């Protein structure tokens, strides 16, 4: 019974780290990346639609993103959505494709992005700690119900703590790498 609680908690922690990684992909570093547009929604015939479903997005150069809409009539809507998303990007529309040049990041902007990365990291750690708390609560209920001994409870809570420490270290490592990527000139 206790093993199931640990397994379930570990899976939830893994998902929290994966969600954090996806969230970081949308934080702009110095290089162009198609993932920065993942959260951009275009009002396409009245329905909010992700840009990735409306256009082919390529990265021909390190600091350039090219968006080729499948439907040329949607090019203006895509451009408006990118501007509205407030990503600090200036798309240029030549009628058939949208080009987004990524300017070099200023020192001030780099520091702002590092703060964002740290905030996301803290949110991920809180999520992991919440999973730990829930797992420990579940184990305590099992012990109260007489399904495990106090020694078993102590052992399982130590196991959950080890998993928590492992996943928090993963989040710290991912955050450190992203910060280095951002601060790279």
UniProtKB/Swiss-Prot annotation:
Major localization listed first in the record, in broad terms: cytoplasm
SUPFAM superfamilies tied to this protein: Ribosome recycling factor, RRF (SSF55194)
GO process terms (BP): translational termination
Places the protein is found: Cytoplasm
Entry superkingdom: Bacteria
Keyword list, A-Z: Cytoplasm, Protein biosynthesis
InterPro entries tied to this protein: Ribosome_recyc_fac, Ribosome_recyc_fac_dom, RRF_sf
Cellular component, GO, one term: cytoplasm
CDD domains reported for this sequence: RRF
GO molecular function: ribosomal large subunit binding
PANTHER family to which the protein is assigned, alphabetical: MITOCHONDRIAL RIBOSOME RECYCLING FACTOR PSEUDO 1 (PTHR20982:SF3), RIBOSOME RECYCLING FACTOR (PTHR20982)
NCBIfam families: frr (TIGR00496)
Family affiliation: Belongs to the RRF family.
Task performed by this protein: Responsible for the release of ribosomes from messenger RNA at the termination of protein biosynthesis. May increase the efficiency of translation by recycling ribosomes from one round of translation to another.
Protein name (database record): Ribosome-recycling factor
Organism: Bacillus cytotoxicus (strain DSM 22905 / CIP 110041 / 391-98 / NVH 391-98)
Name of the gene encoding the protein in the UniProt record: frr
